[in-house]
Amino acid sequence: ICLVFMIFNADFSPIFAQNILPCGTDENLANEILRNPERQEKLFETERSIETYLASNSISSAEQLHLIPVVVHIIYSNQNDNIENAQVYDAISILNEDARRTNPDTSNLRNIFKSVAADLEVEFRLAKKDPNGKCTNGITRTQSNLSLAANNNVKSLIGWDNKKYLNIWVVRSINLSGFSGPGIVLGYAAFPYNNIPGTSDGIVIRHQNFGSIGTA
């Protein structure tokens, strides 16, 4: 999920670096650890699990596309925030261009990154089935004033099983408790860990920074 949000918009800067704007995702993690110190150990456990998996499993060089079902929850306070489906489709398309490295500006990549730039072989697709097995376009709409100054509170309004879907909440504005940086938070994601609850997992992003059309 962190990777997903970097693709969208985020500035992943070190949280305690001097003269560098803090990252909302890092500050969200710091706040979680402050409220629950066990959160740090869960993060370490996940990293160790990944290291163990990589050490005991051979990595195939064969191309294999991994599909990730996505549900976009539009949380709107009024109709001006209730973005159209076309903007959602556009945002997912841009996300996939960057993940698959098919975006038209790849030739402008800085030399320092050229040796590591690659197709992630990951594709994000709007879900076609909801948690009850019913057909869906992968977009939900919920009217709530929580769209204003949103944070993890919007996740309690609606969320699909985070073990089966990537949840993205699109809101009007974001207010992270404890965020010390100037300006505004465009969006943030949760650092994943084993059995992360749905009330913490996922991405929250302003509709003005979601895609390239409509209100973006």
Residue map of PLM features:
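N-terminal zymogen propeptides
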Residues: A17-L65, A99
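Bacterial Sec-dependent N-terminal signal peptides
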Residues: I1-C23
